[in-house]
């Protein structure tokens, strides 16, 4: 119901011309680059998203778009196509990026960039967050004790609580080794059989699929660490350096050319993460902080807007335009202003 209401309101914003007004402003002010962040590609409205985006934006490969953003002003280049620059990115490298996103990219002639996690690609393991869901849903016990709490798994709310506990422990692990050790202990405690892998679409890409996509000319690739840890929680700076630097080395060995872009896992950075990206000699790094990028943007803290493929394209249109973010901030400002006024009124009343 909530999504339907938001879609209807988005339709009002769109067909009233408000979204077009934002587009006009971006086209007639300094050059902007919008970077979108997808993850999965199957089971949603990706096709309708791409139809809308292709019509209203000038979509370029991420590296090409960044080069134009930072260099066009210095060269004094005037572009005939004044549409706002946009780059499409997919994090993690799910198999459905190959079966769905790649297919649509070729069909609609829309370039995309996929950020890969090579540590998973060379094994048959699923991503750790997929593994977390799989463990809880395939538990063979009715009761388990994790981190000093007992969970009664016949109750859905207890299963959800356990999934949240596991996810938090794994996400905030101080090292990749500790993360994998904890997952192994949970698998044993839940008596989950080794067979029964997640759906194929949720598995990592293989190198053969990556090469096939790159050869098409419509897909490029960036780095997303070797094992997808949260860089901010890793306690050893040397491990942060390895996750960031070795990822680039592995990708370049497989692809045969430089890899210049990096995406922070979870959008989480930390001082060590930022330093590691700079020392690994990447040209650019993207976060998941929403907003636009200009030539004044920090090349290692580029903004990206996370998009859910299940969203209606109208929600995507208003989201990219920043309309919902504007009203959210206006609501917070209004609430703060009202509290201030009430406080002043109470003082005057005394």
Where are these regions (language model features)?
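CE4/NodB-like, metal-dependent polysaccharide N-deacetylase domain
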Residues: 79-82, 94, 103-115, 168-195, ...
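Acidic/aromatic-lined carbohydrate-recognition and catalytic surfaces
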Residues: 84-147, 153
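C-terminal active-site subregion of NodB/CE4 polysaccharide deacetylases
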Residues: 1-88, 96, 127-136, 141-144, ...
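Short, catalytically relevant binding-site loops at active-site mouths
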Residues: 121, 227-229
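Extended, charge-rich helix/loop segments that form flexible
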Residues: 8-9, 13, 126-216, 338-350
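Aromatic-lined glycan-binding groove of carbohydrate-active enzymes
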Residues: 220
